[in-house]
Every structure is written in structure tokens, then in C-alpha cells.
A protein has these predicted regions:
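C-terminal edge-of-domain segments
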Residues: 279-321
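Flexible loop/turn segments at secondary-structure boundaries
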Residues: 19-23, 197-199, 287-289, 303-305
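Extended, compositionally biased non-globular segments
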Residues: 219-282
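Composition- and surface-driven signal marking solvent-exposed, interaction-prone regions
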Residues: 1, 203-205, 242-252, 263-268, ...
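Generic beta-strand/beta-sheet core signal
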Residues: 13-15, 190-193, 283, 297-299
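Long, contiguous, structured domain-core segments that constitute the functional module of a protein
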Residues: 86-247, 302, 306-309
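Extended, regular secondary-structure scaffolds
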Residues: 1-155
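Solvent-exposed loop and beta-edge segments used for protein-protein assembly and interaction
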Residues: 6, 272-274, 288-290
Length: 321
């Protein structure tokens, strides 16, 4: 599937099953102390090999599952044809606690798809898809409130389990894209944008940084769309008398319309013009007259990955006596 997605410059979005982690359900996600040790075992040799391939950047696995709808009932989701209560209720009509698997869950890739369509609808690009303020918020999730066994009012987590910041970073490092629910709200957020690819590390820091960028979904989406444009534009020029230099100038004029090099640009401007710098080089293929090879070099606007805080404490020691 990754080979097909790479050939078509069309990222493949899917979801990881809990069995991939050795769980029966994602509610067990908080139990392991170190997930990385699990994925270093011999059982995951093929997964690690897949992550090291070039085409794995076109695969994104979201997780965990998302609540698809509220349980049927007069107070939650009425059925017009007949009176149906999917969950048992107390004497005052409030729902009681029900089994986790009795809820209707759906693939988290659909939630990820809503962030992509929202970003494209607003900006014309699928780059603003992560962070609470950067387009990664999934709002309006089904919020089922019930009476727990101890008599307290509780909310069913619409993403199966609350994921901590530490576990979210751990999952992203392992090649997954977790959806994190904000407690006592009806929304969740995709903080990361990691594809399945494991970024390679080189001796050159610039090469390492470039590998990390190319493994991020927003940048894969942007470069894939530009690749689609280039293929269609080049097809329309077949049969023309265009020289390599003319083709290069023509393509550079076109791609410059998506570049915004202003350092003080707003977040909206960066979402509409996702490239900070770009250029195209066109060269003739040796031994094949009339066949040109176009190389596109792009520098996108970078999104904040992490903020590390340090504390400095100064204490005055009183003098004795």
C-alpha cells in the first residue's frame, strides 16, 4: 500500500489496532512503562524494516478509536421509529455505566480526515492540521455522561483513553499519530504529525533535519500536491518547442506564487503560502532528446515541535548570628 501511495503522491491514512501493541483494547495503553522496549523486540522486526523504507512516509496510522455516536435513547440519540434505550437507565432517566465494547467506535483516520478537509477548505492546503491552535483540534465529539457504579456523574472518554504528553511523544516517536482528548470537554487534538517513517540520522545536522521534516504529514501533503500540479502541467506541454531553460523559468514563476518569505507572516498567511523558499531546476536527460528532468527544492514553514522549559532558582542563605 505504501508503494501505491508513493507512486500516486497520495498519502494513505489508516489506523493502528490495539493488537499491534499486544493489547486487547486501547484502554490498556497506560499499563506499559516503556513502549519503545516492546517495539525493540524480535516480534516487530518487519515493522522496523517498514519504517526504514522511503515509501513509509506516505503511510500514517492514527489511534486510538473515536466514539462514533452516542448510545441510542430518548435523552441522547432518539430513534424515531420506536422507543429504544440502548443503555440501562436509573429511575430518574440517567444512563448507567456500560461496557466499553458496547459503545460504537470508529476508525481514528476519519477524525484525521476532518482536520485535512477543514484545512483545505480554509487555506487551500492541508498543512494546518496539528495542535490545538494550528488546525489539529477535532471538535464536537460525542459526549456520553452517565452515572458510575459509585454514584458519581462521569463522562465516557470519546477517544477510549486519555493519553498523557509523555505517552503521546513516545507514540509519535514509534511512528503513530495519537489523538489526545481534553478531559471534561467534547474535543480532542492531534498534536503530532508523524508518518510511519523513522527519520534517518546523519553526521550532517542539516541532513538529519531534512529527514525529520520529510517524515511529517503536513509537509508530505504539501509536496504531494505540488507534485500533482507539476505532472499535469508538464503533460500539457508535451509536443511544444520548450527548451530546458524556458521550462525552468516557467516552473519557477509558477511555484513562486506559493512562496511567502516574510519573517513576520501570520499563521494564516503561512497556512495559505506553505513554502518559505522554493526553486525548480530543469535539465535534459542524457541520451534522450526532448526528455527533461525537473528537480524541485522546497523549504516549508516549520511548525513548533516542542518547547523545553528550564528553571533557575536563586536562594539567599541567611548569615548565622
Amino acid at each position: 500500500m505504501s508503494n501505491v501511495a508513493a507512486a500516486g503522491f497520495c498519502p494513505f491514512l489508516s489506523a493502528a489496532a490495539p493488537e499491534m501493541f499486544g493489547f486487547d483494547s486501547f484502554t490498556e495503553l497506560s499499563k506499559p512503562r516503556d513502549l519503545e522496549k516492546i517495539f525493540d523486540s524480535a516480534e516487530y522486526v518487519q515493522w522496523r524494516s517498514f519504517r526504514d523504507t522511503e515509501d513509509s512516509r506516505f503511510v500514517t496510522l492514527a489511534m486510538p478509536r473515536v466514539l462514533a455516536r452516542l448510545p441510542y435513547g430518548q435523552a441522547t440519540k432518539p430513534v424515531e421509529a420506536f422507543n429504544y434505550e440502548e443503555v440501562a437507565s436509573t429511575s430518574d432517566g440517567r444512563h448507567t455505566e456500560t461496557a466499553h465494547d458496547d459503545y460504537c467506535w470508529m476508525n481514528a483516520a476519519y477524525a484525521l480526515g476532518t482536520t485535512l478537509t477543514n484545512a483545505f477548505s480554509e487555506y487551500g492546503w492541508c498543512t494546518a492540521i496539528r495542535g490545538a491552535e494550528g488546525g489539529g483540534k477535532v471538535e464536537g465529539l460525542p459526549s456520553h455522561v452517565f452515572v458510575s457504579d459509585d454514584g458519581d456523574t462521569d463522562q465516557k472518554c470519546p477517544t477510549e483513553i486519555g493519553i498523557t504528553d509523555r505517552r503521546e511523544a513516545e507514540l509519535s516517536k514509534l511512528g503513530f499519530l495519537p489523538l489526545c482528548h481534553y478531559k471534561n470537554t467534547d474535543y480532542a487534538v492531534f498534536f503530532g504529525a508523524q508518518t510511519s517513517q523513522r527519520p534517518k540520522k546523519f553526521d550532517n545536522p542539516d541532513a538529519t533535519a531534512n529527514a525529520a521534516i520529510s517524515a511529517r504529514l503536513p509537509y508530505v501533503m504539501a509536496t504531494s500536491r505540488i507534485a500533482h500540479f507539476l505532472k499535469v502541467m508538464a503533460r500539457d506541454k508535451i509536443g511544444s518547442f520548450m527548451e530546458p531553460g524556458e521550462a525552468e523559468a516557467w516552473l519557477n514563476r509558477w511555484i513562486s506564487s506559493y512562496v511567502n518569505g516574510s519573517e513576520g507572516a501570520s499563521a494564516e498567511a503561512k497556512a495559505q503560502y506553505p513554502l518559505r523558499e522554493a526553486r525548480v531546476e530543469v535539465k535534459e536527460v542524457p541520451g534522450q532528446p526532448g526528455v527533461y528532468n525537473a528537480v524541485v527544492m522546497m523549504r516549508p514553514w516549520l511548525q513548533m515541535e516542542e518547547l523545553t522549559a528550564s528553571l533557575r532558582l536563586v536562594a539567599n542563605i541567611p548569615k548565622a548570628g
